[in-house]
Amino acid sequence: DCTQQNGNQGKRIEAHAFQPLANGHIMIAESGAGRIIEIDRNGKIHHQIQLKIRQPHPHRDTRLARKLPNGNYLVCHEGDGAVREYEGKTGEVVWEYDIPLFGKERRGGHGPEAFGNQVFGAVRLPNGNTLIATGNGHSVLEVTPAKKIVWKIEQKDLSGITLAWVTTLEVLPNGNYIIGNCH
């Protein structure tokens, strides 16, 4: 229980991302503590970095996070509406992308009528671009390292499907995408 160990006693903590690592450790993104930790199977912390969070909240600090092959971390910050890449040893932000609103007004809620930039998931592609599930932005964006959108799919672009809260992303071996869509 992340609220009872590793310095989190008495804090409201939510863990939104876990990743088993090749060395046998587990990466965990802790919202509330605002950090990424790598622990062994006994819960001992072997590495940690603090995250840059503009609008701290234990439910919205992070969503999906992944350790990249280069050792850095790619982290979605739902409350900040941003995806950040952190240098794996120092925690320095080395890349950041703020999810655009595309000139639209924010609308509360969780369904297709809501709108915002509460980003949920991101995947680093083999070409170096980042595929981003924009949460209540109802879209998936492919963004270059220079932050240029080179591909996107929006709320009503798929026949018979309305994108609402776009969450998870997976790139299949054949290059196709699996897109999580809920609410």
Per-segment meaning from a language model:
Residues 1-183:
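Histidine-/acidic-rich catalytic cores in large beta-rich domains
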